[in-house]
Structure formats: C-alpha cells, structure tokens
Regions:
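Short alpha-helix in the alpha/beta-hydrolase fold that links the catalytic acid
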Residues: 93, 107-116
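Hydrophobic, aromatic-rich cap/lid helix
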Residues: 20, 38-39, 57-86
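Catalytic active-site module of serine/aspartate enzymes centered on a nucleophile-bearing elbow/loop
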Residues: 119-149
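Short, surface-exposed alpha-helical segments at coil->helix boundaries
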Residues: 18, 22, 54-58, 108-112
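Core-facing hydrophobic residues within beta-strands of well-ordered domains
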Residues: 2-4, 118-121
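Hydrophobic "lid"/C-terminal helical patch
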Residues: 40, 76-79, 114, 140, ...
Length: 149
C-alpha cells in the first residue's frame, strides 16, 4: 500500500456517546468557544502539568478560543459520527498507538482496544493526559523515532 507506517496518538475508534457531542455542538453554537476552551484545556492536561506548564498551555488555550465556532461544531459532528470499531481490524500497516495513562478524552482502554483490533501494533502509554505530545514531548518523540527507525 501507499502507507508504510501509521501512528495513532491519543485517539479512539469510537468517541461516543453521540448525545455528548450533540450537547457540545449546541453549547458552542449558543455561547461560542469560551466555555469549551477552558473545559477542554482542563481535560487535555494532567493536573500536575497544568499547575507547572502554563507556558505550554496558554497558546493552546488561545488557539481554542480563536477557533471558529461553526468549524468546531463541524468537527464535533464528524467525531460524533465516526465509528471505526469494526473497520479498524482492516488496517494492515505497521502501526504505533500512543496513549496517555490519564487521558479522559481517549482513555487507556481506547488505546488498548485500537491496538487489539489492529493487531501487531506497538502500544506506548505515556504518563500524560490527552495532549501527550505537549505534556511528554521527549518520550513522545522517542516513541515516534524508535517506531520509524
């Protein structure tokens, strides 16, 4: 195939329930990005990192705040409707799955389920929440470099 290696980081084959995404879409359409930006940042980083890593978090919070609400709602709809639980098993490419041990958005069980569905996967769990590449950049980079080497 055209893809020789695949890296799936802090993701899932299913991000249900749809009702949660519908509520998020309604909220952003009614009130804009401000309420979601803070809530997202709180979920995307561990408490310890949030307390010590404001320099890394501030630009991400600003980016969320500046995101077009309609565009964000569209992304939420795409995530709501995505269900790869049955088709993930069709992936036959060398795959690295990276997850965060403290990720409430895509918990470790989601990373493990992806790895099991795909088979022959290298699974790396980092001490991080949802943005493991920001919270653990060195460990994340090493995992990627080792996989691609």
């Amino acid at each position: 195939g055209r893809v020789r290696r695949l890296i799936l980081a802090n993701t899932s084959s299913f991000m249900g329930p749809p009702s949660a995404w519908d509520a998020r879409i309604a909220l952003v359409r009614e009130r804009g990005m401000a309420p979601l930006a803070q809530a997202s940042v709180e979920r995307w980083f561990t408490t310890a990192f949030a307390a010590a890593g404001q320099a890394a978090i501030a630009p991400i919070a600003a980016m969320l705040q500046a995101t077009d609400a309609q565009g964000y709602a569209g992304c939420c709809a795409a995530i709501r409707d995505m269900d790869m639980r049955r088709t993930a098993a069709l992936i036959d490419t060398l795959t690295l799955v990276i997850g965060g041990t403290q990720d409430p958005a895509t918990p470790p069980s989601h990373s493990e389920a992806l790895a099991q569905a795909i088979g022959g996967v290298r699974l790396v769990m980092l001490e991080a929440a949802h943005l493991a590449n920001v919270e653990q950049p060195d460990a994340f980079g090493r995992a990627v470099e080792d996989f691609l080497a």
